[in-house]
Amino acid sequence: MTKNDRPPFGFEVLQQDGAARRGRVTSGFGVVDTPAFMPVGTAASVKAMMPEQVASTGAQIILSNTYHLMLRPGPERVERLGGVRKLMGWDGPLLTDSGGFQVMSLGPLRNISEQGVSFKSHLDGSIFHLTPERSTQIQHMLDATITMAFDECTPFPATYDEARASMELSMRWAARSRSAYVARTGYGQFGIVQGSVFEDLRHLSINCLLYTSPSPRDRTRSRMPSSA
């Protein structure tokens, strides 16, 4: 399939019962029926499984990790090899996280500023700088079907003031991630709602990301566990 033949990226609600719903994501590399479980291929490989074995489980999308692929083998090399999907032999859609969760989990090895995050590689201690723009660029180089906005993964527990400051930083980073994103037919970018366990902060976050509240019923939602 050439890029001119790819269907546009989109989402439709197929059925709804109260707050529960069943939907379908359409991408240039296949559909994903939601709710969906994403096998994790951290470093462009789902451990102990070949791509056809992953597909045989019914999985329609794989998640790969920007942080780990940035460190090894590096986004430039992955791009030269045709992207993560080609590298691992996976024909379906691919979602990459922004690298934010892993960077935030480094604790004393990282330093957060308005610009982004500076951190030491857990492999050899080399210094790296990850910004919303760089995270978005790397995910483009990895050829992610779904790119995630760069965010600060708020620690738990957090006070209200800590959660608000973290959420507001993530929303500023989200705007920069959006500006850096290169739109392509069949690809999409997701924002990430922050605000910890505080409902009003989460609604503020939604407003920042979508300019409407609550989340529209015809938009996809991705949930990942909070850091502890």
Give residue ranges: language-model regions.
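Conserved hydrophobic/aromatic pocket- or pore-lining residues that grip, position, or stack substrates
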Residues: Q139, G191, L209
